[in-house]
Structures are given as structure tokens and as C-alpha cells.
Amino acid sequence: MKFIRTKGLVIKKVDFGEGDRIITVFSENFGKIDLLVKGIRKSKKRDQSSVDLLTLSNFTFYKKGDNFILNTIDPIDFFYDLKNDIEKLEITSYILSIINEIIFPGERKKEFFQRIEKALNFIIKNNTQVNFFMILKMMNWIVKNEGYRINISGEKYFNIAESSITDFDDEKVIPLKKELFEILSNIEKKALISNEIANIEILIDAIILYEKYINYHLDTKLNLKKHLFGGYSC
């Protein structure tokens, strides 16, 4: 029997049978994989927390038939600081949804995994405003990493289908406020320093625009509104 070992983050879980659970893990070396955890729901509480959502661990597993079976798990970080802070949990929940939508099973995305791991630790240390801007920069990186680029030839409208910010108005474009254009046009230049970043509402507007862009071009279903419990208007 060949055992496989990798670091990974639990991004989804589904109870299965009387005591089993299937966990979806975004792994460093193998992309997104589903692991069958036998008898975990009948095990002691500590073991259950090791396969809970948003737990970073080293996983050892093997393949049996069409399934990957978890053999051992060594927790690295439970991210309690994220789970116990509602605003940080909102942002983290959205990150998990991005992973679930963007990454296909078995698709190896080591650099993306490393960015996600850094992002989770970044969220712990920073305020909501800076964290929203970090999400925006991550989405910009995703767009570029998937081979797309938003061309800027104006500043009044965002044309999702044409991947451009333009001054030409038609039925396909989205009007841009001046503050929103400033964020979108300088996203790669701005550092993550809170006193240089726009207010939260503008950042959310920018994220939603990127979300619409990614959903259109990558056929995903990102939806920030589902993850905001704090009552932000968007």
C-alpha cells in the first residue's frame, strides 16, 4: 500500500454514513482532494477538530478503489483567532469559497496554496479594511494567473466582456465612481498600508466588480454577499 503525504487546508466537510466524514482538502502538492475519514464522528473531540473546517494539517492518505482514505493527520494550525472573530471569519469564509470555485479536483496550484496560507496569517494580524484590500489584490492575481488582463483606456466604465476600463458607454458597461476607478487602476501599485486604502464600502464595490469579472470569464459563482454577516451594504 502506497501512502501519500501532503500539507493541506480543510475547506469543506460532509458527514457520510453512521460515523464517517468526507473532507475536501486544498493541498500543497495535489490541489483539491476529497479524503474519506473513517469513524471520525465516533472518535474523541480532539480528533474531530483536526478534520474540521479551516484546519491546516499534514495529511497521510492512500488510495483504495476510487477513494482516497485518510490514514493519519498531524494538525499544524486550527486558526482559532479567525474562527472566533466574526469580521475575520467573514473574509476567511469568502477565501474558502474562492478556493472551492477556482480550483478543480487534482489541479496542482502550489503557489496559490502558499498564498492562501500566508493570507490566513495576514488576516489574523490586520484590520478589516486592510484585509478587504488583500482580498482584492488576491483576486487581481487570480485574474492574471488565469491569463486575463484588464486594459485601461479610460476611467468611466468597466466593460467585463471586453476586459477593459473605458470611456465608451453602451448597454454592457458598469459605471465607475471616481474612487472606485482609483482603486482599480492602482491596485498593483498600492501597498497594504491602512492609511493609503479607500474606505470599506469602496473596497467591497471593487471586490464585487472583480467577482463579476471572474464569474463571467471563469464560469464561477463567487458571491461576497453570502459571506458578510456584519451588515455592510453591497
Task: Show where each model-derived region lies.
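Non-catalytic alpha-helical scaffolds and adjoining flexible linkers that form interface surfaces
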Residues: 1-21, 26-234
